[in-house]
Every structure is written in structure tokens, then in C-alpha cells.
């Protein structure tokens, strides 16, 4: 068994030696032309070519939270897309970034109801919808819906639905539900999402109309990894 022995001026040495078992063929490793950066490691391309690469970052690279900033009125059975101000009465309900909450990495962007991702990757979305019924009004269903497009809005597909209901009683009745979805975003210019609400007899979507920095109806985005 042969080895390369590098002797220090103090007398001790460091050696590179062959594998314990005989390789199936001759193996050649080609070193990179320059030194890497601090913390990088050598990686092979499977053909013996070595290069310096950075280790993947541990933990989540991106977490972002968006909050509906006003209440929104739903008609009976109608689906409304939250953030599209043309569908609402009693004020403009828009998505605003919850900058008072902790976030990680790059932010989502939104135009009316459509969210665009900051980079490609696998994303998890947790959409919480809070609604209230007027006195003595029942709702057999209240749905939170997540829609995706992979062709920049030419087609939209409902990918997640979460349902609840509300009893009829005197006074205001609050309900909330949560829909979740994981989306493989391979192209940020075409892969986008939007969030909707629907109720049987109509209801009001609760938003942060008083700007008290409370999350009522909101979405949490997490980038889980590369596509």
C-alpha cells in the first residue's frame, strides 16, 4: 500500500494513503485551481473533478407573514379572492406584510390578490381565515381556499380547501379555519398563488382594520428547500 507523505520541519508528517480495499479501477482526482472560502468543502462531480462548495444552510431560509388589513364582506355562496379590493364593501381589504412579526429571508410580493415568490423552491403555505356571522345567521359551510397557477394566471386550480360552519344565535358568532398546501415553485414568473373565502349565507372576513398588529386572517409562507 503506497502513500504520499508530507513531512513537517519539526519532523512529524501527514500522509495520504490508498483505500483499504483494492479499487475496481484506477481513480484520479483533479484538484480545483484555487483555494475555497472559509467553511467550504470539497465536492466531486462523480468523474473525479473536485470543486469547493458551501454546505447547505441549516433550518428554514425564508419565513414570511401577510395579514389582511380590513374586514371583507362575502355574499351568499360567492367565492371572493382576498386582496382584490374591487370585491369588498366597507373599505379596502388588502394584504400587507406583517413587518411587526419575526420573518426570515426574502419577502413575498403581492399585486391585488396574487402572490409572487421571491425565488424557486418548495414552499409551504398556512392560510388562516377568521369570519363572523351576524346575529341569528347560520352557515352550513365556511371555506378557506388556496389556488395555484403554473402559467401566470391563465388557469387557476383550487388545491386546498378547509371547511367549518357557524351556528345561529343572538350576538356575533366567530369562526376560523386553516388550509395548508405545499407548492413546488419551479418558475417565479409563472407559479403563483391566491387565497379565497366562501360562505353559505354570507359572512364577514375579519381583518386587522384597527391596525392593532393582531393576526386575524393571514398567511404564513415557508421555503422548505430547493425545487
Give short role names for the model-derived ranges.
Residues 20, 31-34, 119, 129-133, ...:
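Non-cytosolic beta-sheet module surface loops
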Residues 30, 116, 182-184, 220:
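Generic structural detector for well-ordered beta-strands
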Residues 55-139, 144, 148, 162, ...:
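Terminal (often C-terminal
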Residues 1-58, 198-202, 224-227:
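Extracellular repetitive beta-rich solenoid segments
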Residues 121-131, 175-180, 191-199:
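Extracellular beta-strand-rich recognition modules
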Residues 109-111, 140-144, 148-187:
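Glycine-rich strand-loop-strand elements at beta-sheet edges
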Residues 1-3, 11, 26, 39, ...:
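Surface-exposed or flexible loop/turn and strand-edge residues in extracellular/cell-surface modules
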Amino acid at each position: 500500500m503506497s502513500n504520499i507523505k508530507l513531512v513537517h520541519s519539526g519532523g512529524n508528517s501527514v500522509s495520504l494513503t490508498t483505500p483499504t480495499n483494492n479499487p475496481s479501477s484506477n481513480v484520479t482526482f483533479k484538484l480545483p485551481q484555487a483555494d475555497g472560502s472559509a467553511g467550504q468543502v470539497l465536492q466531486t462531480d462523480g468523474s473525479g473533478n473536485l470543486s469547493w462548495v458551501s454546505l447547505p444552510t441549516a433550518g428554514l431560509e425564508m419565513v414570511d407573514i401577510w395579514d389582511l388589513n380590513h374586514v371583507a364582506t362575502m355574499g351568499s355562496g360567492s367565492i371572493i379572492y382576498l386582496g382584490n379590493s374591487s370585491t369588498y364593501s366597507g373599505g379596502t381589504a388588502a394584504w400587507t406584510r406583517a413587518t411587526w412579526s419575526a420573518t426570515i429571508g426574502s419577502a413575498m410580493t403581492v399585486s391585488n390578490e396574487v402572490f409572487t415568490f421571491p425565488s424557486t423552491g418548495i414552499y409551504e403555505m398556512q392560510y388562516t381565515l377568521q369570519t363572523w356571522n351576524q346575529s341569528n345567521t347560520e352557515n352550513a359551510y365556511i371555506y378557506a381556499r388556496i389556488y395555484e397557477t403554473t402559467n401566470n394566471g391563465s388557469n387557476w386550480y383550487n388545491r386546498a380547501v378547509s371547511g367549518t360552519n357557524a351556528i345561529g344565535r343572538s350576538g356575533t358568532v366567530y369562526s376560523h379555519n386553516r388550509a395548508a398546501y405545499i407548492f413546488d415553485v419551479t418558475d417565479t414568473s409563472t407559479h403563483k398563488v391566491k387565497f379565497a373565502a366562501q360562505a353559505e349565507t354570507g359572512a364577514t372576513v375579519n381583518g386587522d382594520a384597527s391596525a392593532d398588529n393582531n393576526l386575524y386572517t393571514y398567511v404564513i409562507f415557508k421555503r422548505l428547500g430547493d425545487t
